[in-house]
C-alpha cells in the first residue's frame, strides 16, 4: 500500500531532466527571500527610512526601467558563446544579492534608487536565461510542464517568504533583516547554479542560417527575431494577457477595498494563490492535448469568465462574496493556463541559436503589459461607480478580440509546423 501511494505521488510530478529540478529548487530558495521583502519594502522605506510616498514610488518604479535593459542584455548574453545561460544566471544572482544588501543599508533616496536599479537589472537578466535553459533541457510536450514546474517553484517560494516575513516582522519589527535574508537567498541561488547547473547552450558559435545581415543599429539576432511574423503576432497577444494579469496585482485590490474588509480581501487573494499553486501542474498536463494557440484560446475564455464574475460583484448586488470567490478561482486557473503555454510557444518557434533573444522579447511583453495595466486600472477606479464596475465587463468583452488574434496565430502556426515537417 505504501509503495502504491509513493508511486502515485511520484507519477503526479512530471519526468524532467534533473537540471530542471535543480534550477527550480534554486529559484524556490531565491523566491523565499524575495517574498520576505515584497509587501514590506514600501512600508519600511516610508516609515522606517522616512522617504515620502512619491520617493518610494519613484524608487520602486526605477526597477522596471532597469529591468527592461536587463531583459534585453540578458537575451543577448544567454545566446552568446562567452556568457551563455549559466554565466548570465550567475551574473543575475550576484547583482541581485548586491542590490538586496544595498537596500538593507539604505538611508536616503539616492541609495534607494541605486539599489532598485540594480535589483531590476538583476531580475531582468534572470528571465531570458532561465527560460532559455529550460527550453534547452526539454522538448515537445514535456516543455510546457517544465515551465509549469519552474513557475510553481516561484509561487511556492514567494508564498512561503511572505508568510515567514510577516512572522519575522511581527516578532522582531526589524525590517532590514528581511533584505539581508533576501541577499543571502540570492547567494544560495548563485551557489546552486555554480555547483549544480551545467551550461545548456550547445550552439557551435556560428551565425544561425536564419539570422539576417545587419542593416541597422540593432544586432543581427534582434533583427531576425523582430522580423518573425509568428513572434510579432504573439507579442500583441502576450501584451494583452500581461495587461490582464496586471489587473490582479494592482487594480483588483482597490476594487475590493470599497466592498470588503481587509481580512476578507486577504482571504480572497490567499485563495487565489493557493488554487494557482495546486492547479499549476494538473492544468499544464491537461493542456498538453492542445497546441499552444489553442491552449491560449481556452485561457482567454477563462479570463473572460473571471472578469465577468468580478463584474457581477457590482452589477448583481446579491451574493457579492460568492462572485468574488468564484471570480478569483477562475482567474487563478486562467493565470496558470497562460504562463507555461506562452513560454513554451516562444521556445518552440525560436531558432536554437536565438532562444535567449526570443525569450527576452517574451519577457519584455510583461514589462509593457505592466506599464499599461496599472495606470489603466487606476484611471478606471477613479471614475463613477457605474464606470468603475463596467471596467471589468469591458475587459471581459475584450477577450473576443484576443481570441480572434489567437485564431490567426493558430492559422499561421499550423502553416509554420507544416513547413518544418517538410524540411
Which residues does each predicted region cover?
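C-terminal membrane-cytosol helix-exit motif in multi-pass small-molecule transporters
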Residues: 185-206, 405-410
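Helix-loop boundary and gating motifs at the non-cytosolic
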Residues: 13-64, 230-268
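Helix-to-loop junctions at the C-terminal end of transmembrane segments
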Residues: 70-83, 279-292, 381
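A membrane-interface helix-boundary motif in multi-pass transporters
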Residues: 170-184, 379-400
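Cytoplasmic helix-loop-helix junction between adjacent transmembrane helices
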Residues: 117-156
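C-terminal ends and interior cores of transmembrane alpha-helices
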Residues: 94-107, 302-318
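Conserved MFS/SLC helix-loop-helix module at the cytosolic interface between two early adjacent transmembrane helices
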Residues: 70-106
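Juxtamembrane intracellular "pre-TM" segments in multi-pass secondary transporters
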Residues: 1-17, 200-236
Amino acid at each position: 500500500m505504501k509503495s502504491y501511494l509513493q508511486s502515485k505521488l511520484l507519477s503526479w510530478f512530471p519526468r524532467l531532466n534533473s537540471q530542471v529540478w535543480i534550477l527550480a529548487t534554486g529559484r524556490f530558495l531565491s523566491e523565499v527571500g524575495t517574498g520576505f521583502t515584497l509587501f514590506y519594502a514600501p512600508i519600511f522605506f516610508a516609515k522606517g527610512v522616512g522617504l515620502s510616498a512619491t520617493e518610494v514610488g519613484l524608487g520602486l518604479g526605477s526597477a522596471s526601467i532597469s529591468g527592461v535593459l536587463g531583459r534585453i542584455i540578458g537575451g543577448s548574453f544567454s545566446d552568446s558563446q562567452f556568457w551563455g545561460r549559466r554565466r548570465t544566471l550567475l551574473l543575475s544572482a550576484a547583482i541581485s544579492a548586491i542590490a538586496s544588501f544595498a537596500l538593507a543599508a539604505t538611508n536616503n533616496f539616492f541609495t534607494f534608487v541605486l539599489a532598485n536599479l540594480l535589483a531590476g537589472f538583476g531580475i531582468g537578466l534572470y528571465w531570458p536565461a532561465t527560460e532559455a535553459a529550460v527550453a534547452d533541457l526539454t522538448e515537445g510536450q514535456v516543455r510546457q510542464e517544465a515551465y509549469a514546474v519552474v513557475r510553481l517553484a516561484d509561487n511556492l517560494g514567494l508564498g512561503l517568504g511572505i508568510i515567514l516575513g510577516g512572522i519575522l516582522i511581527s516578532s522582531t519589527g526589524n525590517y532590514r533583516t528581511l533584505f539581508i535574508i533576501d541577499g543571502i537567498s540570492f547567494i544560495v541561488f548563485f551557489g546552486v547554479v555554480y555547483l549544480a547547473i551545467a551550461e545548456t547552450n550547445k550552439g557551435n558559435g556560428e551565425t544561425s542560417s536564419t539570422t539576417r545581415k545587419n542593416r541597422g543599429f540593432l544586432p543581427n539576432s534582434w533583427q531576425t527575431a523582430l522580423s518573425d511574423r509568428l513572434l510579432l503576432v504573439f507579442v500583441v497577444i502576450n501584451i494583452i494577457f500581461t495587461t490582464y494579469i496586471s489587473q490582479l496585482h494592482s487594480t483588483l485590490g482597490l476594487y475590493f477595498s470599497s466592498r470588503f474588509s481587509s481580512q476578507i480581501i486577504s482571504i480572497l487573494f490567499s485563495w487565489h494563490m493557493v488554487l494557482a499553486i495546486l492547479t499549476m501542474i494538473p492544468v499544464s498536463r491537461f493542456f498538453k492535448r492542445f497546441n499552444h494557440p489553442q491552449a491560449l484560446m481556452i485561457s482567454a475564455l477563462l479570463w473572460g469568465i473571471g472578469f465577468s464574475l468580478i463584474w457581477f460583484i457590482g452589477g448583481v448586488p446579491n451574493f457579492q462574496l460568492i462572485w468574488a470567490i468564484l471570480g478569483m478561482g477562475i482567474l487563478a486557473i486562467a493565470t496558470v493556463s497562460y504562463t507555461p503555454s506562452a513560454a513554451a510557444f516562444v521556445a518552440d518557434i525560436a531558432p536554437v541559436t536565438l532562444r535567449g533573444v526570443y525569450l527576452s522579447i517574451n519577457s519584455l511583453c510583461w514589462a509593457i503589459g505592466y506599464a499599461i495595466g496599472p495606470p489603466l486600472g487606476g484611471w478606471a477606479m477613479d471614475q463613477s461607480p457605474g464606470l468603475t464596475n463596467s471596467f471589468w465587463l469591458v475587459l471581459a468583452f475584450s477577450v473576443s478580440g484576443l481570441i480572434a488574434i489567437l485564431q490567426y496565430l493558430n492559422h499561421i502556426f499550423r502553416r509554420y509546423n507544416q513547413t518544418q515537417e517538410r524540411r
